[in-house]
Amino acid sequence: MSRPRTIPDSDVFAAILRLIAEEGEKAVAFSSVARATGLSAPSLVQRYGALPQMIHSALLHEWTRIEATTATAMAEAAKGPQALLKALTNPPSPAMLAASLRDAALRDRARAWRQRVEVALAGRGDKDAAAMLFAAWQGQALWDGISDKGFKMKDAIKRLS
C-alpha cells in the first residue's frame, strides 16, 4: 500500500508555475521542484514519470483553473469590456503562455481561451476591435512588471468601442 500524498498535486503545480514565471521553463527540474516543495526528486519521478509530463500536468492544471475563473468572471461581470477585463484578475502569465505554445494540446487550450474572451469582449460589437482590445490587454500584462503604467486599458476600450 502506498503512502498518502502529503503534498497535493496543486502545490507541486504551483511551484512549477512559479519556477517557470521567475526563471523560465529550463529552471524546472526534478531537483528544483523538490527543493521548492519539500518532496524528494525520486518521489516526483514516481508521481509524474518524466519531466515533460510533470510540466505538462502543471500547465494543464493551470489552464483548467484559468478556464474556470474566466467562466466565473464572464457570468458575474457587469456588461461591457472594461468590467470583464477587471473581472479577469488572473490571466495566464507570459511565461505560461510561452510554455504552452510548445505543446499542441496546450496551444489549443490557449487558442480556445483567447477566442472565448474575444467573443465576450465583442458582445454584439466589432470582432476586430475585440481582438485588438485582447491584444492590448495581453500586451499590457506582458510589460506590467517591466515598465511604468503609462497605458490605461480604459482609454483603449473607449477608443475601440
What positions do the PLM features span?
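Solvent-exposed, amphipathic alpha-helical segments
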Residues: 11, 15-23, 69-76, 96-99, ...
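Hydrophobic alpha-helical connector segments
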Residues: 64, 68-93, 133
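N-terminal intrinsically disordered/low-complexity leader segments
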Residues: 1-6
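Helix-turn-helix
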Residues: 9-11, 15-53, 57
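An amphipathic alpha-helix signature
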Residues: 115-122
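Hydrophobic/aromatic-rich alpha-helical bundle segments in the mid-to-C-terminal region
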Residues: 107, 111, 123-161
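Alpha-helical DNA-contacting segments of helix-turn-helix folds
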Residues: 54-62, 109
